[in-house]
Amino acid sequence: METKHVQFTEEMRKTHTILIPDMLPIHFKLITAVLGRYGYKTELLQNSARAVVDEGLKNVHNDTCYPALLVIGQFLDALKSGKYDPDKVALMISQTGGGCRASNYLHLLRKALEAEYPQIPVISLNFSGLEKSPGFKLTLPLLLKLVDAVLYGDLMMMLYNQCKPYEVNEGDTDAALAATELALAKKAAGRGFGSKRKNYKLILDAFAAVRRKNQEKPRVGIVGEIYVKYSPLANNHLEEFLIRGGCEPVVPGLMDFVLYCAVNNVNDGRIYGFKNTMTRVSSLLYKYLLSLNRKLGKAVDKYVCFRSMDDFEELRKEADKLINQGVKMGEGWLITAEMGCLAKTGTLNIVCTQPFGCLPNHIVAKGMSRRVKDEYPDANIVAIDYDPSATSVNQENRLKLMLANIREKPEHK
C-alpha cells in the first residue's frame, strides 16, 4: 500500500520557499535565479557543519550511499536550525531515473520527514516522468533557460580554476566570479539571459582581465560520482585544497553529464536494435545540446590565454576504446572516458572521488583505473574514499602524498 504524501500545489508557489541542496555553487546560483524568474521562491542551502552528517546518520540507513546521507542531512539540519517555517517550505531533490540509488533519494527524504515534518512537500526534479508536482512544471522555456545556466556555470567554473592558482593579486579571481555571477543572475531574474555570445564574452573578458603569473602548475583532474565530484560539502573543498597545494584543478563540466544522459537513450536503440519516440527525441536533443556546447568551446578558443573543454564526441571515442557505451549505471562510461580524456590531453594526475555505497562508481571509476593506466602509462590516478567515518585528515594525507609524487617528477622540480 502506497503512503500518501503532501504535494507541492499551485497555491504553494506564492507561499512556500523551495530549499535546494548545494551541489554546484556556481551553477545553482544561476539555476535559482532562473527559477525565480518563473515564479518560484527558492533558496540555496549553505549549511555545511558536522551537524549535516550527523542528521544524515540519524535519519538515513547507514548502508545508504554517502551522497544521500549528505543531501538529506543538509535538509534536516536546515529545518532544525529555526531559520525556516516548516509550514512555508518545500524541498527539491533530483531523480535521475536510472538504476542508481539516487532515484530513491526522494523516498528516503520523505521517510526522514515523516516524524517531525509530515506537512513539508518534496518536489522531484526529473526529466523522465518519474513523478510530477501540480505546482512545479518544467516548461520548454524554463528548460531552455536551465540549459543556459548549465553552460554559463561550466564556463565560469572552468575559467575560475584556470585563473585562481595563478592570480597575481589575491582575490581578483573571486571578484571576477562574483561580478559575472551577479550580472547573469540579474539577467536571469529579469527578461532572461539574452544573447549567449554576449554573455560568453562578458564572462571571458572578466576572467581574462585577471593578472596571472607566467608559470605552469601541475594539473589535477577531478572525476567520480557526480555529487561528490562537485560538492564542496561532500569532497571537503577538494578544489580549494588542490589550489592551496600548488595545483590547477581540472573539473569536467556538468553539460558532459547532461549529454551523457541524452545519448544513452540513443545508444540503447543502437545496441539493442530498436527505434521509438524516445530514441528519436533523444537523438535530436543530443545533437542540439552538443551544438550548444561546441559553440561555447569556440567562444573559449578565441582567447589564447584559456584552454577549452574537451569535445563530447572525443569522450565517446575514449569510452569506445576503454569500456563500452552500454555501461550506463550511475555515471557509467562517462567517468572512465573522462579519465581517459584527461590523461590524453596532458592532465595525467587524476583524483577519483569515491563515495561510500556508490557501487557503480567503484566499478566504472576505481575498477577501470587499471585499464586507463594500461592505455596511458604515465597517468597517476588516486581514489579517495568519502564516507561519514572518513576524516578529512586521512583524505588530505592521501592527496598530499599524491602532490609529493607530482613534485618528484623532473618536469615539476
In which residue ranges do the predicted regions lie?
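An N-terminal assembly and electron-transfer interface module characteristic of large anaerobic redox
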Residues: 1-413
